[in-house]
Swiss-Prot record:
It comes from Sodalis glossinidius (strain morsitans). PANTHER family: 4-DIPHOSPHOCYTIDYL-2-C-METHYL-D-ERYTHRITOL KINASE, CHLOROPLASTIC. ATP binds at residues 98-108. InterPro entries: GHMP_kinase_C_dom, GHMP_kinase_C_sf, GHMP_kinase_N_dom, IspE, Ribosomal_Su5_D2-typ_SF, Ribsml_uS5_D2-typ_fold_subgr. HAMAP family: IspE. Pathway: Isoprenoid biosynthesis; isopentenyl diphosphate biosynthesis via DXP pathway; isopentenyl diphosphate from 1-deoxy-D-xylulose 5-phosphate: step 3/6. Keywords: ATP-binding, Isoprene biosynthesis, Kinase, Nucleotide-binding, Transferase. It is an enzyme of class 2 (transferase). This is 4-diphosphocytidyl-2-C-methyl-D-erythritol kinase. It comes from the Bacteria. One of its GO terms (molecular function) is 4-(cytidine 5'-diphospho)-2-C-methyl-D-erythritol kinase activity.
């Protein structure tokens, strides 16, 4: 049976770089929250064992596409190689989240495929197993698989459930894509933030250590963030390029969006601590 599944965006409400491992991976402390806004995947299980993305993303080879990789990973885990009973899937992507935006679009798409096909193929894997599979696809995939707002440590793999205030956000989308290595590889990036407990971090002003680098090297990020800061507390999410302003009400966020200059593209969404994907999963069971 064909089903539609949400692949929500995330925000990093704060992001601190606390060190770097010998293998080059950065150690961090960050707070993830979902948005009630994102991509949509329409998935139809098939009997032929083939994984088909019906509308491939321009410029992304199939073997590099996280949607296809996630489906094949789950297929290999749940069914023996060459098993004639192994199901396939036709997957249609409605893409609204920008690539290189810091909203987790690719990771969220991959997580949605894992969670959705686990249900539709009747694999019966628990969320911990799915999250472990997801980690092999990317450090942000497990938080989307688990579906709870979370405090992340280590390289992002150590997750503690959290419950930040569910505010409204105006997210601005600068016309630029920022690759994570571009920011993490910058010699000026602050990598020695003090490690603090979640309780300490929740009572301190929120900050993103990647923000000064993104603002310095990407004029569009600087322009969009400077505009938002005139109206509300605003920050970079992830390594960018998207920036967000926080509001207590939807009306306040939409009022500011209505004043946005012609060069600014953005949207209003609510922060939620339970992923829309998991609400959809509960509704399907």
């Amino acid at each position: 049976m064909t089903r539609q599944w949400p692949a929500p965006a995330k925000l990093n409400l704060f992001l601190y770089i606390t060190g770097r491992r010998a293998d080059g991976y950065h150690l961090l402390q960050t707070l993830f929250q979902f948005l009630d806004y994102g991509d949509t995947l329409t998935i139809t299980p098939t009997a032929d064992g083939r994984i088909r993305l019906m509308n491939p993303i321009a410029g992304v080879a199939e073997q590099d596409n996280l949607i296809v990789r996630a489906a094949r990973l789950l297929q290999r885990h749940c069914f023996a190689a060459g098993d004639p009973a192994a199901p396939g899937a036709d997957i249609q992507l409605e893409k609204v989240l920008p690539m290189g935006g810091g909203l987790g679009g690719g990771s969220s798409d991959a997580a949605t495929v894992l969670v959705a096909l686990n249900a539709q193929w009747l694999c019966g894997l628990d969320v911990a197993t799915l999250a472990q599979l997801g980690l092999s696809l990317g450090a942000d995939v497990p938080v989307f698989v688990r579906g709870e707002a979370a405090f992340a440590e280590g390289i992002g793999e150590r997750l503690t459930p959290a419950a930040p205030a569910e505010k409204w956000y105006l997210v601005a989308v600068p016309p630029v894509s920022i690759a994570t290595p571009r920011i993490f590889g910058d010699p000026e990036l602050n990598r020695d933030a003090p490690q603090r407990s979640l309780a300490q971090l929740m009572t301190a002003p929120f900050h993103n250590d990647c923000e000064p680098i993104a603002r310095k090297h990407f004029s569009a990020v600087e322009q969009h963030l400077s505009w938002l800061l005139e109206y509300a507390p605003s920050r970079l999410t992830g390594t960018g390029a998207c920036v967000f302003a926080e509001f207590d009400t939807e009306a306040a966020a939409r009022q500011v969006l209505s004043q946005a200059p012609a060069w600014m593209r953005g949207f209003v969404a609510r922060g939620v601590n339970v992923s829309p994907l998991h609400r959809a999963l509960s509704g399907a069971q």
